[in-house]
Each structure stands twice: as structure tokens, then as C-alpha cells.
Swiss-Prot record:
Cofactor(s) essential for the protein: Ca(2+)
Native organism: Pseudonaja textilis
Signal peptide: 1-19
SUPFAM superfamilies in the cross-refs: Phospholipase A2, PLA2 (SSF48619)
The organism's place on the tree of life at top rank: Eukaryota
Protein name stated in the entry: Basic phospholipase A2 textilotoxin A chain
Main location: secreted
Residues that bind Ca(2+): Y55, G57, G59, D76
Keywords for this protein: Calcium, Disulfide bond, Hydrolase, Lipid degradation, Lipid metabolism, Metal-binding, Neurotoxin, Presynaptic neurotoxin, Secreted, Signal, Toxin
Reaction equations catalysed: a 1,2-diacyl-sn-glycero-3-phosphocholine + H2O = a 1-acyl-sn-glycero-3-phosphocholine + a fatty acid + H(+)
Keyword Secreted attributed: yes
Propeptide, chain numbering: 20-27
Length: 145
């Protein structure tokens, strides 16, 4: 092996060792993605819902394109309700488990419970309706005005 290759390998190893002591940032979006995967029995990743229809993703408005999009509309409303309670739903982390019957919340504070419930209801909603690929990165945004 060439010395340059050894240096690169050493650099990668040192980086990984250093990063292992840094805890990952617990972001609600990451948790929501795992809840989605749990609810649909790991058939579809959570990021497939990040830019779906008119409501899945940031800034939802207009007429939902299908039932999955209506799930996102309801999730947006749930987050609005959480904000009215003084919660910060996009930043609130919570404890949950992925059980045989899907995800469920096991958390302590009022905001954690409320936000986790918003996410579990949305994840279960997604799992109960067919996913239509034509609405992923939906191009007919006129309908979303």
C-alpha cells in the first residue's frame, strides 16, 4: 500500500474515532422519519414524504392532491395547535418505540406528548393510504395556491 493511501486511511479512522464521542443532534424531523418507517413496516423511507403533493414538506397550502397529502395537511394543523400551546414542534424531541403494531409514544412533558402524537397519527395515516409516485416532487403547483 502506498504511503498516501495509508495517510488517507489514518485520517478517516481518526475522524471516525473523534466523531464517535459527539452525540448526534436529536432533531424531530429525524424522529418523524423513523416513525414513518415503523408505521409502514419499513417499506418506504420517511424522506419520500418530504416533498409530496401540496402539503408534505414546508409551506403547505391549496387543495391536497390525495389522502396522503391530506395526512400532511392534518399534520401541519396539529403542529399549529402545538405552537398555540407554546410548543416548538419542529424542535421538540420525544421518546417513542416501534412496536409490533407500529409506533407509539412514551414521553414525559406535555409538548413531547403532543408533538409525538402528531407524528404518530401522521405516520399511521401515511401507512393506511397508497403512495402515488406522481405526487412526489409534484410539478402542478398551481393546484397548491
Amino acid at each position: 500500500m502506498h504511503p498516501a493511501h495509508l495517510l488517507v486511511l489514518l485520517g478517516v479512522c481518526v475522524s471516525l474515532l473523534g466523531a464517535s464521542d459527539i452525540p448526534p443532534l436529536p432533531l424531530n424531523l429525524v424522529q418523524f422519519s423513523y416513525l414513518i418507517r415503523c408505521a409502514n413496516k419499513y417499506k418506504r423511507p420517511g424522506w419520500h414524504y418530504a416533498n409530496y403533493g401540496c402539503y408534505c414538506g414546508s409551506g403547505g397550502r391549496g387543495t391536497p392532491v390525495d389522502d396522503v397529502d391530506r395526512c400532511c395537511q392534518a399534520h401541519d394543523k396539529c403542529y399549529e395547535d402545538a405552537e398555540k400551546l407554546g410548543c416548538y414542534p419542529k424542535w421538540t424531541t420525544y421518546y417513542y418505540y416501534c412496536g409490533a403494531n407500529g409506533p407509539y409514544c412514551k414521553t414525559r412533558t406535555k409538548c413531547q406528548r403532543f408533538v409525538c402524537n402528531c407524528d404518530v397519527v401522521a405516520a399511521d395515516c401515511f401507512a393506511s393510504y397508497p403512495y402515488n409516485r406522481r405526487y412526489w416532487f409534484y410539478s402542478n403547483k398551481k393546484r397548491c395556491r
